[in-house]
Every structure is written in structure tokens, then in C-alpha cells.
Amino acid sequence: MSNVTVIGTQWGDEGKGKIVDWLASRADIVVRFQGGHNAGHTLVVGDQIYKLSLLPSGLVRGKIGVIGNGVVVDPKALMTEIDRVTAQGLVVTPETLWIAENAPLILPVHGALDRAREAARGDHKIGTTGRGIGPAYEDKVARRAIRICDLAEPETLDWKLDELLLHHNTLLAGLGAETFTKEQLKDFLAEITPRLLPFSCQVWDRLDEARRAGRRILFEGAQAVMLDVDHGTYPFVTSSNTVAAVAASGSGVSPSSVGFVLGIAKAYTTRVGEGPFPTELHDQTGRTLGERGHEFGTVTGRPRRCGWFDAVLIRRAVRVGGVSGIALTKLDVLDGLDEISICVGYELDGQKIETFPSAPGAQTRVKPVYETMPGWKETTAGARSWAELPAQAIKYVRRIEELIEAPVTLLSTSPERDDTILMRDPFED
């Protein structure tokens, strides 16, 4: 029996929500280990539609949900989300939701700085959601973050707020934005502290006990490898590491506890916001993929850019992300296309290359080298076994496996939870 870690392998929005929900029904504990409330997904359970950004997906299946120390927590957003799902019938208590006491908080000053800096960038925006994720991670690394455990120590909180405001107010004033007083932040924290503190605990200790007891743990990643602050399309990335190794450091478990790493990838590629996108399609095919795939951001509502499957990027994600197998989603969106292209390499300044460059200028200059395959006219929507798939769709999946150097262990053929073909059980690996 193994634990399972789920990560995205593209630029997010790969359909992690459905896959995590599908796996969560077989797990005992579901853990968020990085990111904040800047990414979200939609889960459908019976006649209820849940939109989650911070809460672990397992809560909708009656499992224990964990927010690890690697997550930056906006307490206001968290309480709003808890109130919303509670009104829908979910039970969210300190027994069902554990939050790491050493998780850093996102305060109103972080969002204000995030938005002020993005506005000041003019034509060089990086596409931040303006929710304070980046500034909160900056504070963590600079050792001035307010952590949940600080709320229980008024004296500690007092001097840490002084240090935090000295930094942030200097930046805000320099950007011509409104500054904050200590009283404003104290009032904000005083309001949420009674609700937040009961959920806080030593998550690392509880997870270690669960592991020793043989309980199945599902680690739920946010964003994706190509948005990783080190390995993604920097600076058009998120502010945290998103690879599977962070499941350990972001929740306080040993590296060996990460288990089977399931990378999620769409059968094509999408991206929200700014940044390089070698296989982006600006034609009718791109628009068709967006319309069929309902490609709009869960959190931002922004339309996603669409393009062909990029095997070069996924192969990189497999290697740096530690991916054991791929869950390929939205295969049905490709139904009916005459031809389907896969990016198998790039051209950069007239030379062929087999890996994606790190320099921003080179990333924007690469041109995709495509391999084209015939499409299929039959439908794959709702298929639940290989026997139900068109022969050409199977060839497409097999070619992807060859190019990314990893097996497709799970195939999703519609947004419905049970429209899933399982080739290999990650929990039994």
C-alpha cells in the first residue's frame, strides 16, 4: 500500500480536482502542502457543486483534510470558504480539518502590495491574481511572516507586526499606495483568531502517527510544475515550489512518505495569463479546444489560452517532478478533429533543441516542432474501458507515453467522476 501525491505537469487547470476527488474516496487523509487561495477547482458530489481554493478536496468525501505548513493561509478567505461549504452540508470542525500551526498567514497588507506592484509593472505584468500569495511567501523566506501559532502569543505578535509593517509600508509608500497601521492588522487578526486557532495543530506529528498506523494519505498539489518558482517559466510562475518533493517539506513528513507521484496532464495544453506558451493556437482549432473544454479559470474567470500537447514540457515535468505515472484528462475534447499535433521538439534561432530553455527571451523565441497524427471521429466521452476507445485515440495515448517517457496510468474521458479508465492503481503500487 502506498501514499499518493498528485501534481500538475503543465500550467495548472489540468483537471486535478476530479482526479483528487476520485482518489480521495479511497484515502483516509488529504493534504494540501503548498500554494494559497490563488488556484481552485470545482467538485460535483450528487447535486452539490463545491468550489474549493484552500480546503483540501477530501473534505467533500468525509475525509480528514490537512493544510500543511507549506501553504500560505488567508484566514478571511479560509473562513469564507468554510462557511460556504458548511452551508452546503459539509462538516468542517477541528476534528475534520487540521491546519499546521507553523503555516504563514496572508494579511490585507500582502494583497495591497501584490496589486500595487502589479499595477506599477505596466506592460511587464506577470499575471498575479493580486491575492497576496507572493508577498506572503517573501515574508516567510525573510523571516518576518506572521504564523498561525503567533496568534496565541500577543507579545510575539506585537513585535512581529512592527517588523512586518516597517518593510511593507516602506514599499507601499514608494509605490504611491495606501499604507497600513498596526491597529488595522490587529483588528483584522482579533476578528479571525477565535475561529482559526482551534483548527491549528502540529500537523507533522499527526501525519507521522497516521503513517505509522498504515492510513492512506493523499497529498494534493496546487498549480503545476511549469509554474514552479525554480523549474517553471520564470518569472511567469507562482511563488512556491510545486514539484512532488515539496509534499514532504510542505507538510512535515519524510521524503519516503510521498509515495506514488501521479502527474496530471490534459490531452492538449492550456495556460491562464501571461508567459511563454510554445504550442499556443491562435486559430479556430484553439478556439474550438477552449469552447469544448470550457476553458475558464475557476478563481479568476479568465479565458485560458489553448494549444497542442507539448511532450517536451511534460517530459521535463516527469523528470523534475518525480512523476511515477500520468493521469491524462479531457481526451474527449479532441473528439472529431481531423488531425492532432504533438510537440516533439523545438527550434531556437534555427537550431533544433530537445529541452525547454530557462532564459525568458529564449522561451519566447522557441518554435514547436510537430508530429501530426490522424484524429478520430468516434466519441471517447464517457468511456470507462480501453475497449470503448477508438483505435486512433489509443494510438494517441500510446504515442504520448513514448514521448514523455512515463506510463499513462489513468485516463479521464469526461468531467463525470466515474468516467475514468484505471490502468494502474496508485494506492496499490
From Swiss-Prot:
GO MF, any single term:
magnesium ion binding
Q: Alphabetically, which GO biological process terms does the record hold?
A: 'de novo' AMP biosynthetic process; IMP metabolic process
TM segments?
A: none
Q: Does the keyword Nucleus apply?
A: no
Q: Which reaction does it catalyse?
A: IMP + L-aspartate + GTP = N(6)-(1,2-dicarboxyethyl)-AMP + GDP + phosphate + 2 H(+)
Q: Where does IMP bind?
A: 13-16, 38-41, 129, 143, 223, 238, 302
- Cofactor or coenzyme needed: Mg(2+)
Might you give the EC number(s) for this enzyme? 6.3.4.4
According to its record, what are the GO cellular component terms?
Answer: cytoplasm
Annotated protein name in UniProt: Adenylosuccinate synthetase
